[in-house]
Amino acid sequence: GDAVIRSETNTAISTQSGYGVVELNMTGGTISTGSSTGYAVYAREKSRVNIGGGNVTGGTAVMVYDSANVTVTGGTLEGKKAAIGKGSSATPVISVTGGKFSSDVKEFVPEGNTTDTDSEGNFIVVVDKAKAVAEANGVGYTTVQAAIDAVANSDAAGTVKLLPSKAESVAVPAGANVTLDIPAGVTLTNTNGAHTITNSGQLAITGEGHVD
């Protein structure tokens, strides 16, 4: 939605979990603080913060402490100090696979991805073609199975694109709807004599590549 949450001098939202695990899901709107040293979102303790859209702005857009779990798949995070900060003694889980950022978030992107800048100077997440073997929904994966699982765990059908040739036996789980795109010159082969693809869901194969 278009909700606006703002603090002029302090943290706009703190997810301190005094009554069980607190979860913040943001798909739009704005969370901001006018403080140049404040946090727009302060993720604390065992809370969960999921940002898929909207704008988060502060001294630090999202500050993560303790063992909080933060996932960013979209939106714009802008901080005068940092887009995402982490406490020095904190042990959180932070995963960034999409969005735009005022500072580099490379340390938070999963293997198979890296960061670049767009035409406006924002940091964005891109597939690391040197490490990823497959891509799904703009995110790179270091195994084909991980990309298939990502589609299977989503709410919709999706396409997994094989990047280089790969020797890997994979499985499409029941309930999944996956299109496997194999470009020309690329081959998916089995390992240890197993079936290359075991399909228990819905599978379509496109492209001019091969499955052996």
Model-inferred region functions:
Residues 8-9, 157-193:
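N-terminal extracellular ligand-recognition/capping segment immediately after the signal peptide
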Residues 1-6, 13-35, 42-59, 63-78, ...:
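Surface-exposed loop/turn motifs in large extracellular/passenger domains
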